[in-house]
Amino acid sequence: MGQKINPTGFRLAVTKDWASKWFAKSTDFSTVLKQDIDVRNYLRQKLANASVGRVVIERPAKSARITIHSARPGVVIGKKGEDIEVLKRDLQVLMGVPVHVNIEEIRRPELDAQIIADGIAQQLEKRVQFRRAMKRAMQNAMRSGAKGIKIMTSGRLNGADIARSEWYREGRVPLHTLRANVDYATSEAHTTYGVLGLKVWVYTEGNIKSSKPEHESKQRKAGRRNAAAN
């Protein structure tokens, strides 16, 4: 029976980039990694209503740069930049180095897998029917230009005694094609019946072209033809 790999890890260095960009010695690696996890957990709680999609952490020499991708940058910044200053102070305490925070706006939040997953989780916590929440998110994504979307939820759905999983898919979501631009995210909904898990796959904009120059691939093909002819 085939098992599904994490689509983001599967496509690293092909179509996806790392969310943490730094190098550490083996003696410091676990400490730095734990800091990254703490920072992401803090931002997830602090910015729960800011529609945060991706958080990129970079570590230049003895400092840190955090880029927050949000559909609602005004909520992150706050009035006259007050909230972002508080955020920066808290992050400096967590990381122990000077922190620079950048905010980037997500233009189409309906196509961001993390925002979709968090949005469904918030609806489930407000006792919205899980099928209705899932199908509404799928319709919004397809209307916004997605080629395909798949949403899966697991747990005690609608308060059932036995936990189960249900998933819905619209369009196509290629899992084996490395060049396919598949965005993947997970989230959790904490309900009175327990924790529900959510997984979202969003396929957009078709296949991504290879990063290799076109003339290079043509030269290789010509070389293979000459070798075969000889």
UniProtKB/Swiss-Prot annotation:
Return the InterPro entries for the record.
KH_dom (IPR004087), KH_dom-like_a/b (IPR015946), KH_dom_type_2 (IPR004044), KH_sf_prok-type (IPR009019), Ribosomal_S3_C_sf (IPR036419), Ribosomal_uS3_bac-typ (IPR005704), Ribosomal_uS3_C (IPR001351), Ribosomal_uS3_CS (IPR018280)
Top-rank lineage group of the source organism: Bacteria
Q: Per the record, which residues fall in region Disordered? A: 210-230
Spell out the molecular function terms from Gene Ontology. mRNA binding; rRNA binding; structural constituent of ribosome
Q: Name one GO biological process term.
A: translation
The cross-references to CDD domains, in alphabetical order and at most eight, read: KH-II_30S_S3 (cd02412)
What residue stretches are annotated with the KH type-2 domain? 39-107
- What's in the keyword line of the UniProt record? Ribonucleoprotein, Ribosomal protein, RNA-binding, rRNA-binding
Task: Please give the GO cellular component terms listed in this UniProt entry.
Answer: cytosolic small ribosomal subunit
Pfam families from the UniProt entry: KH_2, Ribosomal_S3_C
Family the entry assigns = Belongs to the universal ribosomal protein uS3 family.
Q: What is the annotated quaternary arrangement, including any partners? A: Part of the 30S ribosomal subunit. Forms a tight complex with proteins S10 and S14.
The job of this chain, per UniProt, is described as: Binds the lower part of the 30S subunit head. Binds mRNA in the 70S ribosome, positioning it for translation.
How is this protein named in the record?
Answer: Small ribosomal subunit protein uS3
Organism expressing this protein natively: Neisseria meningitidis serogroup B (strain ATCC BAA-335 / MC58)
The gene for this chain is rpsC
